[in-house]
Amino acid sequence: MSGTVNTFSARAGGMLLALACLAGSAAAATGPAGYALDNTEVRDIRARALQRDYQLYVALPDSYRDGARRYPVLFVADANYAFPVVRNIAQRLHKHAGMEEVIVVGLSYAKGDNGMHSRRRDYTPSVPRKQAYSAVMPGRPPEFGQAAAYGKFLTSEVLPLVARHYRADMRRKVFVGHSYGSLLGLEMLLSEPRSFEHYILGSPSLWFDAGVMFEREKAYAGRHRDLPASVFFGIGGLERLAPGKKRSRSEEDADMVEDLREFDGALRTHRYPHLKTQLRVFHEEDHASVFPSVLTHGLRSYLSSSK
């Protein structure tokens, strides 16, 4: 009997060892679980006119499940990197500075696209006339100039979806962009300014296409007597032209700080009755580091706070 038990135990031990090895192999293959942000979800959305697929990354406030109130909603370009930054800063400003809570909606790049390829195409207002660009996706030429079409996708499909599925206060919509993302914001500001009630635009690439947005601003002023919008511009103080270089409207020789001052000044000269702009230069920041500061001050310029 004891031999039988010993034989069984040996077999059972062998089976357990085999199972342990298999479990170890599976764990090694899958790796540790990824980190998830609380109260977030992802929605797929088809841009029908563009024939492309995107995702919306949605962060809900901590109090969302507790009542029936509606919340201001932030729409964030370049969400693949900006969404967690915006979500966490907005949450921290609420918890520690008394800022009202918000819903955050991140706008992803197109599915299957390299991020740079997607943002070049969807966020820029025109095809560059004087500068050639290399492809960033194998087998696909560079694409530019579809900001107007992408903006229509936002207003006709994304905004209605958010209004249907979430308790968003659609009278308090905020667009958040940086760099090319700010070009998209300017495209919408100068075509359908009421798409959003507030624009937070960091380090806009006003050098793009030899300063085409300056032309768009001038054309808008020639056709309109008002620009109903609230805009917060922010930029890093280090986003200036290097000493000894001659300023031009090209990526290599742009003085982005002076470009933004000039653009904001042009808007102000028209004295639009319902336009409110602010411009802030963050002196120790550059193009890569300035976004969190722009976001923080841009939110504070629009949202209410109890402290």
What do these predicted regions represent?
Residues 177-181, 185:
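Gly/Ala-rich beta-loop-alpha elbow adjacent to hydrolase catalytic centers
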Residues 207-276, 281:
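The feature captures the conserved acid-bearing segment of alpha/beta-hydrolase catalytic domains
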Residues 187-197:
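Conserved hydrolase catalytic core segment
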Residues 26-72:
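A domain-start/cap signature at the N-terminus of enzymes
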Residues 100, 195-205, 230:
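A conserved short beta-strand
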Residues 69-153, 157, 161, 165:
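Serine-hydrolase catalytic machinery in alpha/beta-hydrolase-like enzymes
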Residues 167-178, 199:
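Alpha/beta-hydrolase fold nucleophile elbow
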Residues 13-24:
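Bacterial N-terminal signal peptides
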